[in-house]
C-alpha cells in the first residue's frame, strides 16, 4: 500500500511493540479496522468477504463464504484502493470496472490464500487424490529456513522480504492478466454474443 511503502516492518508478537505500530497484520489477536489491526487468530473470528462491504455495489458483492485470513482482511479493507491504480494506469480501463476485478481477484487469488491459511481442504471431507505443494502459500512457506539451516533474525527478515516480493509480484501479475487479457477477451465475447 502506498501509504506504508517506506515503513519499517517489525516482526514480533510482543504486544508492547505491536501497540507502537501503525498497522498490525496476522498477529496480536485483534481484528479492528478502526485501529488497523488485522488478525484472524481468535476463536470468535468468522468474517468472510461475502459480508457487506461499503465500497462494493450490491450487484458486485461477493458471495464467498471462506473465512478470511490476514491476507483476506487486508484485501477486504484495502483491495479496492490497491487495485484502482493498477487498473487505470496504463491499461486504459475505466474505474467503474473496479468492483468486477475486485471480486475476480478474490475468487482467483486471495480466497485460495485465505482457505489454505485457515486449514480448509480443497476437497472438503473427501479424500485428496494428491497434494498441491507448488501454490503460493507453499512457495512462501518454502522460504522459511529448514531446521538445519541458519535461521537467525537477520536471515528470517531477509527471507520475509523475499516472500513479500514473491507474493506481491504474483498479485500484480494476476491483476495484470485480468486487466490486459481477461477483461478485453470478455468484452469481445460479449460483443459477439450481442450480434
Regions picked out by a protein language model, each given a short descriptive name:
Residues 142-195:
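Hydrophobic helix-and-loop "lid/oligomerization" segment in the mid-to-C-terminal part
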